[in-house]
Amino acid sequence: MGMSDVYLRSRTAMERLASSDTFPVIARSSACRSLFGPVDHEELGRELRMRLAELNAEDQNRWDFNFQQDVPLRGPGRLQWMEVDSESVPAFYRETVQVGRCRLQLGPRPPPVAVAVIPRSGPPAGEAPDGLEEAPEQPPSAPASAVVAEPTPPATPAPASDLTSDPIPEVTLVATSDPTPDPIPDANPDVATRDGEEQVPEQVSEQGEESGAEPGDELGTEPVSEQGEEQGAEPVEEKDEEPEEEQGAEPVEEQGAEPVEEQNGEPVEEQDENQEQRGQELKDQPLSGIPGRPAPGTAAANANDFFAKRKRTAQENKASNDVPPGCPSPNVAPGVGAVEQTPRKRLR
């Protein structure tokens, strides 16, 4: 039953295709009815020859030309064929033959009638040897191509490229060799001097930290600002209890007794005693968890009172010409975030 179903379905499908307008109505062959059975090749051959004969007849009626014999039809018709020279026909309509990579045009044909229309079928077997014989009759095309190919690879461009390539490395070598040796000796002494300069201040700074209060630069610049920051946190009661005369009198007497001045011109012993007093006061005052800083409640009031008293002492020092012009004056407010390493070391 399976084969019968396929047979019926295939037949109905072919009928639908044949009845559609897309395909022309033609005689249905037996090959469609025997797809799943033995094929009759003789019958298929006869149907093919019949179809080709119908196509040839249609072409002859349309062009009045016999494409099988490659001659126009005799007798009156819609089209009149006339003989013309092959050179007058555009190259597009001429027959060509390809030899290797070149395509050559065939010469005039031996038959007397020239055709200006492209034939449907290929040339007959008799014309093949004529075309082969006529192809070698045009030798100028082959030697012309050979002559053109010969001058393309001459030996002249090779030395030209060599000459151009030779001076290029010479120029680059000269350009690279000149500047490179010059900066090398210049850079070495600079680096050596810089290294020496860097090593000297490092040693001096280390010695200054170990010696303590001997160098005047450290005492004149860093400790003053550090003292100012820590003194801003000093409580008011302790400053009120201390007599102001001692602060002003002790440094003056000691200055007259032992005037030891260094680069900044400030007495060293006075600063040492001030730092010792500050250390004792910092030990007595209440701390907020950070060394050198008071509790957050008394910071603002103590700072204002301290700066007011500090300004008076600065005026007295200026009147007595104790502070040289180049050194920072004590009445200047301490910088924000200044270093506090020296006082902390001494407190410890």
UniProtKB/Swiss-Prot annotation:
It is found in: Nucleus. Expressed in the heart, brain, lung, skeletal muscle, kidney, pancreas and testis. High levels are seen in the placenta while low levels are seen in the liver. Residues 275-284 have a biased composition (Basic and acidic residues). Pfam families: CDI (PF02234). Potent tight-binding inhibitor of several G1 cyclin/CDK complexes (cyclin E-CDK2, cyclin D2-CDK4, and cyclin A-CDK2) and, to lesser extent, of the mitotic cyclin B-CDC2. Negative regulator of cell proliferation. May play a role in maintenance of the non-proliferative state throughout life. Belongs to the CDI family. This is Cyclin-dependent kinase inhibitor 1C. The lineage of its organism: Eukaryota, Metazoa, Chordata, Craniata, Vertebrata. The gene is Cdkn1c.
